[in-house]
């Protein structure tokens, strides 16, 4: 077994576990919204990012602002970085899907309606506006992860509720919400609308995660 294969397998497993952490955090948030405790839910959502940071898991929005875009010799590796991020994103989505399937095992539809409301709200915004708002989430994510890597995890408890209350979409949280929504939601909206919306959130998060690099001439 080659080292490249082992690294890819480890990365994918890590990204799946990261998606599971985000999915469980999203589940808690939906449950709190269901009970009228949205503020508590926003704080509990921090569990996902705290898990990712402390276990050094691969999360798309926790990696996009730090992945090397250039090699040590200064040559461009942008497209390779994008492939790495999409690989991580795929694993994250798989993890979110596993939790969404588990959520459907409940006897009561706890959080299903709340997930539907979030999905319909994103669709009402449209892909361009939702994608633009996702930039804010990416910026917050890179900021709080930077603080956490410096031994200041308290920033996570502020940053996560902040992007939730600002209405900034997080592409992995949204992936969980969409898969947790009632199946009938997908009969009333064209799947194409969702497939157009989601990449805009991913791109918006990527731009936001890299705002520090975009606006600063100095390389990492």
Protein language model features and the residues they cover:
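Alpha-helical transmembrane segments and their helix-helix packing motifs
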Residues: 1-220
């Amino acid at each position: 077994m080659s080292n490249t294969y082992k690294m890819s397998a480890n990365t994918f497993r890590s990204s799946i576990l990261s998606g599971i952490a985000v999915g469980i955090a999203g589940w808690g948030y939906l449950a709190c919204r269901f009970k009228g405790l949205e503020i508590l839910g926003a704080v509990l959502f921090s569990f996902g990012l705290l898990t990712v940071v402390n276990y050094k898991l691969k999360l798309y929005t926790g990696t996009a602002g730090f992945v090397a875009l250039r090699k040590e010799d200064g040559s461009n590796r942008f497209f390779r970085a994008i492939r790495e991020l999409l690989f991580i994103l795929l694993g994250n989505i798989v993890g979110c899907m596993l939790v969404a399937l588990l959520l459907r095992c409940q006897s009561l539809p706890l959080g299903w309606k709340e997930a539907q409301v979030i999905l319909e709200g994103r669709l009402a915004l449209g892909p361009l506006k939702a994608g633009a708002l996702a930039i804010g989430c990416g910026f917050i994510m890179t900021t709080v992860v930077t603080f956490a890597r410096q031994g200041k995890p308290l920033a996570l408890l502020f940053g996560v509720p902040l992007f939730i209350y600002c209405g900034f979409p997080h592409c992995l949280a949204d992936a969980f919400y969409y898969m947790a929504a009632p199946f009938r939601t997908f009969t009333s909206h064209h799947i194409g609308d969702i497939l157009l919306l989601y990449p805009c959130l991913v791109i918006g998060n990527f731009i936001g995660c890299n705002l520090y690099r975009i606006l600063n001439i100095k390389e990492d």
